[in-house]
Structure formats: structure tokens, C-alpha cells
A protein has these predicted regions:
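Glycine/threonine-rich phosphate-binding loop and adjacent beta-strand/alpha-helix elements that clamp
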Residues: 1-158
Length: 158
């Protein structure tokens, strides 16, 4: 783009047209792995008659998508990722909405195992969003990290 002349120039393609994508495409073999524990995804929706509120829970046990706890056999690394999503809200008050994610991530192999626990909650009022939570991390069962989160973000018309 040349603003002094208001000309917009694009390069011209000078190669040969392709037949299309290679329908015999090859890829590397899958990494050998073993499922150590089968996973599942539980889903529930509950309605509370007394508070006129709903709770929706999606709970990935042994994997975010239910893939289970698995080990990459060549290197011995084990992966476990559990993720629970919980949303609650009253029919009478949209500002009562509360969304919490509880996450556990374990990775490692013999002599080196990380374990992280993360909980984050989002709520709101008419002016702000609030994000609170914490993270704890351990290596080989020794606690090595903690952080608390507490943020307020203006809604700016949202």
C-alpha cells in the first residue's frame, strides 16, 4: 500500500496450479501410550425449587474430555488432567451467575512428578466482573508454589 499514490499492489502468483491436496497424505505414527485408568465426563443439571436457581456441572474425571490417565510409553511420562466446570444462576437474578473451574493437572515420571491444583471463580455485579481463585503446585509431593487471584474488571457496558 502506497499512501502517496493510493495504489495497492499485491504480488502475482507465477507457479504452477496444483492438482489439489494429496489424498494419500502421510503422517508420523502415533506415540505409543498406555491408558492407566479410564476416564469419563459426568454432566448434571439441577434445579432448586426453593431458590429458583440452576446448577450445571461438567466434570471431566481422568481427562478433560474423558480420555483417561495415560502414559507415553517411550519416555514414561504420565498425564492426568481433571477439570470440573460449575455454573449456577438464579432465574430471578442474572447477576447471581457464578462460574467456577476446578482443575487438577498431574504430569511426570519416576522421580519427577508435578501436581497443580487450580480453582478460579467468576462472578459479577452491575458494574464489575470479579475473578478470584488460587493455584497450588507441588513437585514430588513437596509444595513449591501458591498464588491467590483477586481481580475486579469494569464491565464497560457489557
Amino acid at each position: 500500500l502506497d499512501l502517496s499514490t493510493a495504489k495497492f499492489a499485491l504480488p502475482m502468483f507465477s507457479g504452477k496450479d496444483a492438482e489439489g491436496p494429496n489424498m494419500e497424505a502421510r503422517c508420523a505414527p502415533l506415540t505409543p501410550m498406555t491408558t492407566l485408568s479410564p476416564g469419563r465426563v459426568d454432566r448434571t443439571i439441577e434445579y432448586d425449587l426453593l431458590t429458583d436457581s440452576w446448577t450445571s456441572i461438567t466434570n471431566g474425571v481422568g481427562g478433560v474430555f474423558g480420555e483417561g490417565i495415560y502414559r507415553f510409553d517411550d519416555i514414561g511420562t504420565v498425564v492426568e488432567h481433571n477439570l470440573k466446570r460449575e455454573l449456577t444462576m438464579s432465574n430471578k437474578d442474572p447477576l447471581s451467575a457464578k462460574y467456577t473451574i476446578t482443575q487438577k493437572m498431574k504430569n511426570g515420571r519416576d522421580g519427577w512428578l508435578t501436581d497443580c491444583d487450580i480453582v478460579v471463580t467468576q462472578t459479577a455485579d452491575k458494574d464489575n466482573f470479579y475473578i478470584t481463585g488460587h493455584m497450588d503446585a507441588s513437585i514430588n509431593d513437596e509444595h513449591v508454589f501458591h498464588r491467590d487471584y483477586d481481580y475486579k474488571v469494569k464491565r464497560n457496558g457489557i
